[in-house]
């Protein structure tokens, strides 16, 4: 490691401002925070920033559903996000929003520089338009089948299954995610970033050797497939920044979202006054820039983002660190099973340090998915943190407090053992630097096993009962506490709250350099419980709470959905199909109503005398609730003339009058247009 402190700017991907933080998000933020805390522990200068990704049609539509402005909604979500991250001890130096003055200024500047340098063009394109909502459909509001791998139910910009990016018009069988309607094509002028002009630069950047091999290999696939111009504009209505000099045209959210890294840092510079924005972002910057992201957004960060920066005169990232997804109990996070756990729900039931430790224990520097096995989570935290590490302090601290007034021995009895523990610092440092946190944890727990073996062999609880062995007891416990101190120094980036409580107990700050020398002739404070084991019932309660939250949210969402319009067919579906010959048997005729009277002792029936063209018929019809008899005399209607006469209580009915409606007062007699004559056949 260089002697001079490094200057690093570190970012996490920007959470979208239309939903809550969940344990999938937390993998990235914990991974980045551990790395950042390690860098700070080694004396490097780190600026750790993030922001909410606050633009796009999804936010605009959700705000409408909630009955508030997009600005009010993203402010509310930002407060929730920051509260959750703080709950997990994510040590951001600044948390901002892409909907900010800084981001508007920088997005406009970068666009205009790209345009000036010949990297922006425009052309008329045909794009999908929702005929019901009368709006162009952004990528994420079209769903269909991926044109490459044929996976169904994929969004209109990229496929979650194979990672391919494409235009919404390339989707197979597209549907509007807003209304469910089949979109139609409509012309619109759009603006494009000429990504192919940067292919040579991007290939060189890929071959630099700093990118993860999986990322470099994926980029090579994209190069072989041919880079395409990138559509960076969207049509109104849209919540975002208008493109300078254009009417009703907005920057696509993926243009201004990564610029949000710059906007958040600019905001931090303005707050602090001792930071130089240009020192970190100029093309010749000597500082280091790192992005932690998920594997679903590699395309944007490894192709578009470095090309945009290069084309507008800014520096490119030093590296992009990509991680996989979180699964729970070997399966995709599920709301119905309660394994889709919000950060806030977790914090209501469990210590955030437990998840920080478990994620660290399973993380490596590859793009592997991480499985949060809840049974293993409970067992590993209890076995490693409680039984091996914290217990090491509790087994020794009581004797130091009670027998030696809290004073460690002036003599360190096991220099060779301590040298082994201190000597692991370089190896563990290399692993933290390389983001091989799981391997670092294994090194630390292996040392913890050795420390506990030492205490078991020395048995201070036995020595304490032996007369004249006070010095031996103090020496043993001093060694045990010092080994605990070394372990907690190594764990400080992973478990900062536990490290802080340890520092209070030791009455000394834990520093990486301090590991080199044991703590002797030093007073510690009375020992208090440093960490609580996980009760499986806490995990069960968290899962049940997640199920309940998901059910309540689904019920609320269903209630908020516009009810599909009830139609007459939905209320009274069609009867089974019949053959034409069956229908041809029915003889429908125009009939003139000669007389009409109410049938006594009947609530429904009217008695009609009908002229069907030279023949008079008596017909009873159940439309009494809808008509006054005298209003019908002289009208024309339609009758089934060849229906077999039916004897009724009040007389013989020689046909059937046709009427429409659900019943009661909602009945309407069928009447032909003027010109129809009694006896005419209805064709």
Curated annotation (Swiss-Prot):
UniProt: ATP binding residues? 335
- Name the SUPFAM superfamilies on file: Anticodon-binding domain of a subclass of class I aminoacyl-tRNA synthetases, Methionyl-tRNA synthetase (MetRS), Zn-domain, Nucleic acid-binding proteins, Nucleotidylyl transferase
Extent of motif 'KMSKS' region: 332-336
**Placement of sequence motif 'HIGH' region:** 15-25
Q: Where are the transmembrane segments?
A: none
CDD domains, per this entry? Anticodon_Ia_Met (cd07957), MetRS_core (cd00814), tRNA_bind_EcMetRS_like (cd02800)
Subunit text: Homodimer.
Query: What name is this protein filed under?
Result: Methionine--tRNA ligase
Q: Which gene name belongs to this protein?
A: metG
């Amino acid at each position: 490691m260089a002697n001079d402190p490094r200057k690093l700017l570190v970012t996490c991907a920007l959470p979208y401002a239309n939903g809550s933080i969940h344990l999938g998000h937390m993998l990235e933020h914990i991974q980045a925070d551990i790395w950042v805390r390690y860098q700070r522990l080694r004396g490097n200068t780190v600026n750790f920033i993030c922001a909410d990704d606050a633009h796009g049609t999804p936010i605009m539509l959700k705000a409408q559903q909630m009955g508030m402005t997009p600005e009010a909604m993203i402010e509310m979500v930002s407060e929730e996000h920051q509260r959750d991250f703080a709950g997990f001890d994510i040590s951001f130096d600044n948390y901002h929003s892409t909907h900010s003055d800084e981001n508007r200024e920088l997005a406009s500047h970068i666009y205009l520089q790209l345009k000036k340098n010949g990297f922006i063009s425009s052309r008329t394109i045909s794009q999908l338009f929702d005929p019901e909502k009368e709006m162009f459909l952004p990528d994420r509001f079209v769903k269909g089948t991926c044109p490459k791998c044929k996976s169904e139910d994929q969004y209109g910009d990229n496929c979650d299954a194979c990672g391919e990016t494409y235009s919404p018009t390339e989707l197979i069988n597209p549907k509007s995610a807003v209304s469910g309607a089949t979109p139609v094509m409509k012309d619109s002028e759009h603006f494009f970033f000429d990504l192919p002009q940067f292919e040579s630069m991007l290939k060189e950047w890929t071959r630099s050797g700093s990118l993860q091999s999986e990322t470099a290999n994926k980029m090579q696939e994209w190069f072989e497939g041919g880079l395409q111009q990138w559509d960076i504009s969207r049509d109104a209505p849209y919540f975002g920044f208008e493109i300078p000099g254009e009417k009703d045209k907005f920057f696509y959210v993926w243009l201004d979202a990564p610029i949000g890294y710059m906007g958040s840092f600019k905001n931090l510079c303005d707050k602090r006054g001792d930071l130089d924005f240009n020192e970190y972002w100029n093309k010749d910057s000597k500082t280091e820039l790192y992005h932690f992201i998920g594997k679903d957004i590699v395309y944007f960060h490894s192709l578009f983002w470095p090309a945009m920066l290069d084309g507008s005169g800014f520096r490119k990232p030093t590296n992009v660190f990509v991680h996989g997804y979180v699964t729970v109990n070997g399966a995709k996070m599920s709301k119905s099973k309660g394994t889709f756990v919000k950060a806030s729900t977790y914090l209501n039931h469990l210590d955030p340090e437990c998840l920080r430790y478990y994620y660290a224990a399973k993380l490596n520097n590859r793009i592997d998915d991480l499985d949060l096995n809840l049974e293993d989570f409970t067992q590993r935290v209890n076995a490693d943190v409680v039984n091996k590490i914290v217990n090491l302090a509790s087994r020794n601290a009581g004797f130091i407090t009670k027998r030696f007034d809290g004073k460690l021995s002036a003599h360190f009895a096991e220099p060779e053992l301590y040298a082994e523990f201190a000597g692991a610092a370089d190896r563990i440092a290399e692993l933290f630097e390389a983001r091989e946190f799981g391997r670092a944890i294994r090194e630390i727990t292996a040392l913890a096993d050795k420390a506990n073996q030492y205490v078991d062999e020395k048995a201070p609880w036995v020595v304490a009962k032996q007369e004249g062995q006070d010095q031996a007891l103090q020496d043993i416990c001093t060694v045990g506490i010092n080994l605990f101190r070394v372990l907690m120094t190594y764990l400080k980036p992973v478990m900062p709250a536990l490290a802080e409580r340890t520092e209070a107990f030791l009455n000394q700050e834990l520093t990486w350099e301090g590991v080199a020398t044991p703590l002797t002739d030093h007073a510690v404070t009375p020992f208090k419980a440093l960490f609580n084991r996980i009760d499986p019932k806490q995990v069960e309660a968290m899962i049940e709470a997640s199920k309940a939250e998901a059910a309540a949210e689904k019920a609320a969402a269903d209630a908020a959905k516009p009810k599909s319009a009830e139609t007459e067919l939905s209320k009274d579906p069609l009867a089974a199909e019949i053959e034409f010959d069956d229908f041809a048997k029915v003889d429908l005729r125009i009939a003139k109503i000669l007389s009409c009277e109410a049938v006594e002792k009947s609530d429904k029936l009217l008695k009609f005398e009908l002229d069907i063209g030279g023949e008079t018929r008596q017909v009873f019809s159940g439309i009494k609730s809808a008509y006054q008899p005298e209003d019908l005399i002289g009208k024309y209607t339609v009758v089934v003339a060849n229906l077999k006469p039916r004897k009724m209580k009040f007389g013989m009915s020689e046909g059937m009058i046709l009427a429409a409606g659900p019943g009661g007062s909602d009945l309407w007699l069928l009447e032909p247009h003027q010109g129809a004559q009694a006896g005419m056949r209805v064709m």
